[in-house]
């Protein structure tokens, strides 16, 4: 990737599809961690480090890979 190209965040459908491939869902993950079923969906729309980490762990990656715009250096 060139330095002037911006990394793109995963589309929310890609995050959900990745979870489905692992036989998971956002609501199941939310309940597993003691949240209301819709709570982790907030991480798809806005920066919430704890929720992003839960989702990233389930997808076996890092939050900055899924949401690079939220973790850009110097911001």
From Swiss-Prot:
<dbReference type="GO" id="GO:0030430">
    <property type="term" value="C:host cell cytoplasm"/>
</dbReference>
<keyword id="KW-1035">Host cytoplasm</keyword>
<dbReference type="InterPro" id="IPR010982">
    <property type="entry name" value="Lambda_DNA-bd_dom_sf"/>
</dbReference>
<keyword id="KW-0244">Early protein</keyword>
<dbReference type="GO" id="GO:0003677">
    <property type="term" value="F:DNA binding"/>
</dbReference>
<comment type="similarity">
    <text>Belongs to the ner transcriptional regulatory family.</text>
</comment>
<keyword id="KW-0678">Repressor</keyword>
<dbReference type="InterPro" id="IPR038722">
    <property type="entry name" value="Ner_HTH_dom"/>
</dbReference>
<dbReference type="GO" id="GO:0017053">
    <property type="term" value="C:transcription repressor complex"/>
</dbReference>
<keyword id="KW-0238">DNA-binding</keyword>
<keyword id="KW-0805">Transcription regulation</keyword>
<feature type="modified residue" description="N-pyruvate 2-iminyl-cysteine; by host">
    <location>
        <position position="2"/>
    </location>
</feature>
<keyword id="KW-0804">Transcription</keyword>
<dbReference type="Pfam" id="PF13693">
    <property type="entry name" value="HTH_35"/>
</dbReference>
<protein>
    <recommendedName>
        <fullName>Negative regulator of transcription</fullName>
    </recommendedName>
</protein>
<keyword id="KW-0670">Pyruvate</keyword>
<feature type="DNA-binding region" description="H-T-H motif">
    <location>
        <begin position="26"/>
        <end position="45"/>
    </location>
</feature>
<comment type="function">
    <text>Switches off the PcM promoter thereby blocking expression of the major repressor Repc (latency factor) and favoring transcription from the early promoter (Pe) and hence viral transposition and lytic development. Negatively regulates the early promoter (Pe) thereby controlling its own expression and keeping the level of early genes expression independent of the viral genome copy number.</text>
</comment>
